[in-house]
Amino acid sequence: LYAGVITRPESQQWFAQSLPKFAAAYDYTAIMAMPYMENEQPLSRKEAARWLGKLVAEVKRSNVPLDKTVFELQAVNWRTKQPVPAEEMTDWMTLLKKEGVKNLAYYPDNFLQDQPPLKTVKPAFSVQR
């Protein structure tokens, strides 16, 4: 699901996507939580984290249970064609988990070049406290 249909409800008609309808029809709904892709202007690291926080807040306002969502993070900044630093990704995961998000994913997974480095991101996937 494009994040824009959550943050800008008027775009639901353009994409024919709706978080509440998807959540009612599927066990899980993957949300493209990709701040560097969704915004027209380049974002700083701090702005990207703030954008993710706003996205979670909008999902909570939708009354769709967070455990029915998967927040799919971007591992590449397609604007710069550079990997998102693994430390930034783990910071995003920490932020999302603090907000109650349980299901995390990322794309793309360049396992042949260990990007993002598994030893860095794997511990962040644990929801154990």
Which residue ranges define each predicted feature?
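Substrate-binding cleft of secreted/luminal carbohydrate-active enzymes
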Residues: 25-42, 48-52, 58, 62-129
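Distinct, well-ordered alpha-helical segments
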Residues: 7-22
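Aromatic-lined carbohydrate-binding surfaces of glycoside hydrolases
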Residues: 1-8, 33-37
